[in-house]
UniProtKB/Swiss-Prot annotation:
Residues 157-184 are annotated as: Disordered. It comes from Saccharomyces cerevisiae (strain ATCC 204508 / S288c). Required for exosome-dependent processing of pre-rRNA and small nucleolar RNA (snRNA) precursors. Involved in processing of 35S pre-rRNA at the A0, A1 and A2 sites. Required for activity of RRP6 in 7S pre-rRNA processing. Also has a role in 3'-processing of U4 and U5 small nuclear RNAs (snRNAs). Acts as a mRNA export factor. Mediates mRNA degradation upon UV irradiation. Maintains genome integrity where it is involved in both non-homologous end joining (NHEJ) and homologous recombination pathway repair of double strand DNA breaks. During NHEJ, required for joining 3'-overhanging ends. Residues 164-184 have a biased composition (Basic residues). One of its GO terms (molecular function) is double-stranded RNA binding. Belongs to the C1D family. GO terms for biological process: exonucleolytic trimming to generate mature 3'-end of 5.8S rRNA from tricistronic rRNA transcript (SSU-rRNA, 5.8S rRNA, LSU-rRNA); maturation of 5.8S rRNA; nuclear mRNA surveillance; nuclear polyadenylation-dependent CUT catabolic process; nuclear polyadenylation-dependent rRNA catabolic process; poly(A)-dependent snoRNA 3'-end processing; post-transcriptional tethering of RNA polymerase II gene DNA at nuclear periphery; regulation of gene expression. This is Exosome complex protein LRP1. Keywords: Exosome, Nucleus, RNA-binding, rRNA processing. One of its GO terms (cellular component) is exosome (RNase complex). It is found in: Nucleus. InterPro entries: Exosome-assoc_fac/DNA_repair, Sas10/Utp3/C1D.
Amino acid sequence: MEDIEKIKPYVRSFSKALDELKPEIEKLTSKSLDEQLLLLSDERAKLELINRYAYVLSSLMFANMKVLGVKDMSPILGELKRVKSYMDKAKQYDNRITKSNEKSQAEQEKAKNIISNVLDGNKNQFEPSISRSNFQGKHTKFENDELAESTTTKIIDSTDHIRKASSKKSKRLDKVGKKKGGKK
């Protein structure tokens, strides 16, 4: 008796699910598949309807086999796998079409912008790949002017000192050369 009480919620849930499924099945089977296909003009919609039919039939067959306690479910599982692969292929096709449409729309927008820029005379709207700042010179400004002045003064002083020393040296050499020349 305890086992029956444990199963009752599952049976109620299953019964509720069947009640929800019944109107959907009636909607699918109200007209034959051929009649429904004739009403549709779009090939993609026809593919969707056929895939839905195959999935519903395979799923119902699977549920029926489970209820009957059939052990070998491989044929129906193979059929469900095949239907799923068809549904996946349809989804991939939709994704490709969407990407293709987005790409062509982006190309059209780009062409439209280029044509409008040329016609409007905005030829210089596109910037060069190298920034103009790369063609400008760099000017370094010294922060400490006193340091620069003292460095300049030191350089000038040392240059003057070197000149004086070299002129003294050349005068001495001249004197030595005259003395040697005078002894001859």
